[in-house]
């Protein structure tokens, strides 16, 4: 399991909704990644739409997948 020190926090915009609560997110630096909602966002029933600004956490081991940890207002 990755520790907090092993994560990279970035911001991006939701580009596409994928099946299974996954999302295509375009990062600020122009790199597209696949992301899923973190557990607390699922429990709070927070939904994402195309165009939402989000904060994602990425593991240093796999830079193509991320976890959405915050949806900006």
Swiss-Prot record:
Record's subcellular location: Cytoplasm
Matches recorded under PROSITE patterns: S1_IF1_TYPE
SUPFAM superfamilies: Nucleic acid-binding proteins
GO CC, alphabetical: cytosol
Domain S1-like intervals: 1-73
Keyword terms, alphabetized: Cytoplasm, Initiation factor, Protein biosynthesis, RNA-binding, rRNA-binding
Keyword Metal-binding: no
Pfam families: eIF-1a
GO molecular function terms noted in the UniProt entry: ribosome binding; rRNA binding; translation initiation factor activity
Subunit organization: Component of the 30S ribosomal translation pre-initiation complex which assembles on the 30S ribosome in the order IF-2 and IF-3, IF-1 and N-formylmethionyl-tRNA(fMet); mRNA recruitment can occur at any time during PIC assembly.
Function summary: One of the essential components for the initiation of protein synthesis. Stabilizes the binding of IF-2 and IF-3 on the 30S subunit to which N-formylmethionyl-tRNA(fMet) subsequently binds. Helps modulate mRNA selection, yielding the 30S pre-initiation complex (PIC). Upon addition of the 50S ribosomal subunit IF-1, IF-2 and IF-3 are released leaving the mature 70S translation initiation complex.
UniProt family annotation: Belongs to the IF-1 family.
PANTHER family given in the database record: TRANSLATION INITIATION FACTOR IF-1, CHLOROPLASTIC
HAMAP family: IF_1
Protein name per the record: Translation initiation factor IF-1
């Amino acid at each position: 399991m990755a520790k907090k020190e092993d994560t990279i926090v970035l911001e991006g915009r939701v580009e596409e909704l994928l099946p299974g609560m996954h999302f295509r997110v375009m990062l600020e630096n122009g790199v597209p990644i696949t992301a899923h909602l973190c557990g607390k966002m699922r429990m709070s029933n927070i939904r994402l739409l195309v165009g939402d600004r989000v904060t994602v956490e990425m593991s240093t081991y796999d830079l193509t997948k991320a976890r959405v940890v915050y949806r900006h207002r």
